[in-house]
Regions:
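Solvent-exposed, non-transmembrane regions of membrane-associated and secreted proteins
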Residues: 1-177
Length: 177
């Protein structure tokens, strides 16, 4: 489950065998233009093993799914709102809390990298995504850090590959046992 405080993002997260599985399918298995919020299919089944937990959702014009990311990104209060925003991911056994540290628009896909050859390559990845950010935040990260990446389309008809990308740095984990 995902909740982003200060927004209406409050949805179950699914994971399919491909990234197309839940693109136009709801959590009940029915066709839905809005699809579902879903993890990248390449992520490890055990959530805690992922260095970069990539989560996709549509930018629906009716305000649902990840539309709130676009609304937040385009707002004049983006930086001040990010100060109190939290990304919460609930699994069966834990709550993972992330603090936003990077946000940008991208027409690439390297932000969705889920496998890293080494911890040094992961830190290099963190440096890259941090340098792209429009946020004025300088959170400290290192090779032991973990992040989540929220991704939604911009609905830019001139560039259909362009995405809004929001990265959160894992700051707390609460175990339910």
């Amino acid at each position: 489950w995902i909740v982003v405080t200060g927004t209406n993002i409050d949805y179950p997260i699914l994971q399919g065998s491909t990234n197309n599985t839940y693109l136009r399918t709801d959590y009940k298995g029915n066709h839905a233009n809005g699809g579902s919020i879903f993890f990248d299919y390449r992520m490890a089944e055990k959530y805690s093993l992922n260095l970069n937990a990539v989560i996709y959702g549509h930018n629906m014009t009716n305000g649902t799914m990840f539309r709130a990311i676009r609304t937040w990104y385009e707002s004049a209060t983006r930086n001040s709102t990010a100060e109190t925003m939290r990304i919460e991911v609930y699994t069966a056994d834990s709550l993972y809390i992330y603090t936003p540290f990077s946000a940008y628009r991208s027409d690439g896909s390297d932000f969705a990298t889920t496998g890293f050859a080494s911890y040094d390559s992961f830190v290099s990845f963190l440096d890259t995504i941090s340098s792209r950010s429009v946020l004025g935040r300088n959170l400290t990260y290192d090779s032991d850090s973990k992040i989540c990446t929220l991704v939604t389309c911009t609905n830019n008809s001139g560039n259909v590959k362009e995405r809004y990308v929001l990265h959160g740095l894992l700051t707390q984990v609460y175990n339910f046992d």
